Regions:
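Short, polar/acidic, helix-capping and beta-turn segments at strand->helix junctions
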Residues: 14, 43-44, 55-60, 101, ...
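Short amphipathic alpha-helical segments
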Residues: 13-38
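A broad, low-specificity signal marking well-ordered, structured residues that form hydrophobic/aromatic
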Residues: 3, 50, 95
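An amphipathic, aromatic/His-enriched active-site/gating alpha helix that lines ligand/cofactor pockets
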Residues: 35, 56-94
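Short glycine-/aliphatic-rich beta-strand segments at the starts of folded cytosolic domains
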Residues: 2-16
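Hydrophobic pocket/interface hotspot
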Residues: 5, 17, 21, 52
């Protein structure tokens, strides 16, 4: 599954946030991978808006696996002061963002359609096979 989330970094602490993420602890990287976090990226807007993206089999399970690691506890404690909404630990204060479009999913769905695309004539209500309509138009133009 694909997961997108957002949070907020204090704008005055963005440079420190970037610096810490430029050299994430190797044991934290390994823990994320071992917990099932794949293709994980963070994006930081100029106003402190943080967008995260990851792929995993089961987000709640991947998050739960991270929650029990010692390194995650240390990392979250180090990062907590950088977040604007610091009532919760940083890894629990994410707002999940709904995915509304994915190119590959829609292309795969379109490729799996076996029947020609059909539309309904607005005047007569008749079903029109667009492949047949295109063929008839080509014959008329010849």
């Amino acid at each position: 599954m694909r997961v997108c989330f957002r949070s907020s970094v204090h704008p005055e602490l963005m440079a420190e946030y970037k610096q810490r993420h430029a050299a994430v602890w190797p044991e934290m990287l390994k823990a994320l991978k071992d917990a099932g976090w794949n293709n994980y990226s963070l994006f930081l807007a100029p106003d402190g808006q943080l967008i995260g993206y990851l792929e995993c089999e089961d987000y709640k399970a991947a998050q739960a696996r991270m929650a029990v690691t010692e390194v995650n506890g240390r990392w979250q404690a180090e990062m907590a002061t950088l977040f604007a909404n610091s009532d919760l630990p940083p890894d629990q204060g994410f707002e999940i963002v709904e995915e509304v479009f994915n190119l590959e999913d829609q292309l795969a769905a379109a490729d799996s359609v076996k029947e020609p695309y059909a539309v309904t004539d607005a005047v007569t209500g008749a079903h029109i096979n667009t492949d047949s309509a295109a063929h008839e138009y080509q014959k008329e133009q010849a």
